Amino acid sequence: MDFADYIRTFNTGDDAVLVRDFYAPDIHFQSGPRILRGTDELLQFLNWAHDGIREIIRAQTVLRDENRIFAEIDMDFHATKDKPDFTFGALKKGEFTTVKFFVLYTLRDGRVARFKAATWPPNLGVTKPDSAAVLGAAPAQAPAAHLTQATATAPTRAPVAHLTGSPATPARPPAALASPPVTAPSQAPSGAPAQRAQPARSSAAERLGGTPEGRQAFMDYTRAFSNADFDSFSRFYTDDVRCELPSAVLERREAIVGFYREMFKTVRESLTLHQLIADDAGLAADVTSQFTAIEDAPHFVVAALKKGEFVRVRVFVYYTLRDGKIASIRVARAGIPSKPQRL
């Protein structure tokens, strides 16, 4: 599938053509808790969602391998009529709001067979549209995709960092347009704490990326994180690493270490990795994270937990890399947390 063609078609607002040309008949579509099956359900949903709303994709980052595309998207929602009950906040005709989406497309025979999306709160961490996008013009093309080596699709259990954070309030109200736009929108197994981390590897072995060694380095990083081996997992960061959670931003390596050193006194984190796309520019992970209380944690940000209880949540995590080290981390929830359960 040509993702640039997909974006161009999406941005025309012709949902029937989009569904006909780019989605498999048995598409499984999930956006947060909403699940749709088949192209008939999908088209019905798009017709409803785009009643009075023009939706424009502005792709910020695209990673892909043979059968998957991961995209970080700033999505502009333009109101073509008053929408007081709009999902992402009330809009009047001529107003727009922007929402950051993290989307994983799984392909089969050149069409989207599975679609999974997570979002940040409106206007949080987004770029501003240029004048062409504001007027509803489709971008000429998507950003160049990073081609990656295929990774195993079978779930792999490993701990991972930075999956906490609660939804934030909108960063700013919708911006009014000078003129209206053109009219045309799993369960992870529980278990005992992970084994102790292995001895520190050489700097060459710590280089993250799309090679088999680079993906193994990512597993080493997550293993060190799960074992609270702060010296080891922090070696995978650049000095100026930036971690963007839905509710907070952590600047620099020492801030991330300090945040998790405090958290790990009461709550430990592990995950089931469902899919990973990797190249030398970045890593995109679709995971279910499990948070387990080792002491009572009544104020834990995901859910209040008693000692021995755990909670799970599906998330997308996107890491950008610089010289084989993590330079930035962005996290988005792909569903609501489970209710606390006991091991």
Write out the residue ranges for each language-model feature.
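C-terminal and inter-domain tail/linker signature
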Residues: M1-L343
